[in-house]
Amino acid sequence: MQITDMSFVLDFQKRKGYVPYESPELAAYKTEYKSSPEGLWTWGVIIVAGIAYNPNLVPADQAPKSWKDLLDPRWKDAINVKVSTSGLQHVTWYMIRQLYGDDYWKKFGELNPRAFDSYVQQFDRTVNGQDKVALTAQYSGYLMMKAKGAPVEFVIPPDGVVAAPQPWGIVKEAPHPAAAQLFMDWFLSLPGQTGNAEVLLTHSARSDVPPPPGGVSINEFKVLTPTDWHAFEQTHAQFVREWNKITGLR
């Protein structure tokens, strides 16, 4: 099972929802990419996000270059984000808040951002000209759209791109536990992770896996991700409350 919100991953672990299985592939993963104790879950995917814009609507010299540039009033009613159920959006809120404080999101809320469930909706609106800019724009979505020739550009802020994990683990009372273990062995392996990166255009937590087609290595980014996931988990209710207010979903 994979969950894309670390708050739910840690809660599921507390509820003893995972069955321990120490795949031999775990040796290829850094300690911070694995559960404590090991064998409950492992980062199967790293999702990177930055800023995207439509170059047909926003000239390159006028495009946002940093997260702070997104506070410019000219993006009012022209910027989209993810909804509060997104683990990636929670990470973005958390990390930008650490960088710039609470005032950042208060000012951002004045832009009337539109929130959507899927990165596909975010990029569709940006490419179609309904919005000019996307915040928490997934790098994988950008690569997919760019490969199709869509008018979209990706901005790597100098203050860093946001990165969130997609942990994978085996649930208790799985109907076919042996098959689940075999799948985890394959998925966490070099061939499994390489195939996943090629198909989904995401990054792997394994250092020996090439970057997604058309993309650059995650090592070339300054990465913004929580170092204390338990502290991050404690902010979930606050994030949902504030984000729903910012996006008009309260």
Language model: regions and residue ranges:
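A bilobed periplasmic-binding-protein/Venus flytrap-type ligand-binding module shared by bacterial periplasmic
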Residues: 50-57, 164-176, 195-196
